[in-house]
Swiss-Prot record:
InterPro entries: ITPase-like_fam (IPR029001), Maf-like (IPR003697). Belongs to the Maf family. YhdE subfamily. This is dTTP/UTP pyrophosphatase. The record marks 12, 69, 151 as: Important for substrate specificity. The lineage of its organism: Archaea, Methanobacteriati, Methanobacteriota, Thermococci, Thermococcales. It comes from Pyrococcus furiosus (strain ATCC 43587 / DSM 3638 / JCM 8422 / Vc1). NCBIfam families: maf. Pfam families: Maf.
Length: 190
């Protein structure tokens, strides 16, 4: 059976995928900042494809999975904040509003290339300055698109979501389904 190679250094993607499969983590060397499309969904897919193809050359007999998550508000991409001030600004922008979390994915297995994107709508509650300052102090905003992590302390910021929760964390469940369809067996947990 082919090995599953995750082309990511994201601990969240590793955690989600390793719940279902035995995986090998091997981050790609793609410079994501150089890939920009007008449409955020196309950007996420293109970055995921670049990551997957980067590793497909190194691991041609295995199954490669790559993903990229982008947060958008009114069509504007909110990347990973560079510092606490930028994180604070992002959280204030998101306060009381609905934004989209887009995860582009690409799976390469032999001659099969599966690509797509999942979009989840996330509505933030009205955030007080005190709540924003508290969240900034947790440091959880670091290395997170949009400046928050829904799976941790950031859950308190969210009023509700429409769609796949795991997509907001970083890897939509559809990727797991596609791997099963490709013949990969779920790992035994008992």
């Amino acid at each position: 059976m082919k090995k599953i190679i995750l082309a990511s250094s994201s601990p969240r993607r590793r955690e989600i995928l390793s719940r279902f499969f035995d995986i090998i983590v091997h981050p790609s060397n793609v410079n994501e900042d150089k890939i920009k499309e007008k449409d955020p969904t196309e950007t996420a897919i293109k970055i995921a494809k670049a990551k997957a193809f980067d590793l497909a050359v190194k691991f041609p007999t295995d199954t490669i999975i790559a993903a990229d998550t982008i947060v958008t508000l009114n069509g504007k991409i909110l990347g990973k904040p560079k510092d606490s001030e930028e994180a604070r600004k992002m959280l204030k922008q998101l306060s009381g509003k609905t934004h989209e979390v887009v995860t582009g994915y690409c799976i390469i297995s032999g001659d099969k290339i599966i690509e797509g994107a999942e979009i989840t709508k996330v509505k933030f509650r009205e955030l007080s300055d005190d709540l924003i300052e508290w969240y900034i102090s947790t440091q959880e905003w670091r290395d997170k698109a949009g400046g928050y992590g829904i799976q941790g302390f950031g859950a308190i910021l969210v009023e509700h979501i429409e769609g796949d929760y795991y997509n907001v964390v970083g890897l939509p469940i559809i990727v797991i389904i596609k791997l099963i369809e490709l013949g990969h067996k779920l790992k035994r947990i008992f």
